[in-house]
């Protein structure tokens, strides 16, 4: 259904913005604005600052993207008060 193939890149969430939008720093050093994909929204997958994610970019606009996957191994540190 897509006209062009999308570009998938790895990155790290740098900042959380309103309306489930995030700033993601990609492996190549570029910073893009990305939103959560519909499947991640449907399954209530939470994304926090510092999470490693996979971002899908279109060749038309390389400054905006869609977060399609959150790496399971990258968890934010927990506080001692919770233990």
UniProtKB/Swiss-Prot annotation:
**Protein's UniProt keywords contain ATP-binding:** no
As for subcellular location, the record says: Cytoplasm
Output one GO MF annotation: rRNA binding
S1-like domain residues: 1-72
Which keywords accompany this UniProt record? Cytoplasm, Initiation factor, Protein biosynthesis, RNA-binding, rRNA-binding
One cellular component (GO) term of this entry:
cytosol
Q: Which Gene3D superfamilies match?
A: Nucleic acid-binding proteins
Keyword RNA-binding assigned to the entry: answer is yes
Q: Assembly and interactions?
A: Component of the 30S ribosomal translation pre-initiation complex which assembles on the 30S ribosome in the order IF-2 and IF-3, IF-1 and N-formylmethionyl-tRNA(fMet); mRNA recruitment can occur at any time during PIC assembly.
- Please name the PANTHER family in this protein's record: TRANSLATION INITIATION FACTOR IF-1, CHLOROPLASTIC (PTHR33370:SF1)
Q: What is stated as this protein's family in its record?
A: Belongs to the IF-1 family.
Query: What function is annotated for this protein?
Result: One of the essential components for the initiation of protein synthesis. Stabilizes the binding of IF-2 and IF-3 on the 30S subunit to which N-formylmethionyl-tRNA(fMet) subsequently binds. Helps modulate mRNA selection, yielding the 30S pre-initiation complex (PIC). Upon addition of the 50S ribosomal subunit IF-1, IF-2 and IF-3 are released leaving the mature 70S translation initiation complex.
> Can you name this protein?
Translation initiation factor IF-1
């Amino acid at each position: 259904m897509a006209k062009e193939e999308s570009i998938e890149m790895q990155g790290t969430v740098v900042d959380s913005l309103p309306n489930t939008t995030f700033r993601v720093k990609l492996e190549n050093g570029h910073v893009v604005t990305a939103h959560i994909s519909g499947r991640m929204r449907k399954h209530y997958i939470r994304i926090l600052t510092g999470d490693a994610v996979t971002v899908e970019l279109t060749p038309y606009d390389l400054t905006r993207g869609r977060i399609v996957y959150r790496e399971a191994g990258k968890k934010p540190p927990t506080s001692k008060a919770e233990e």
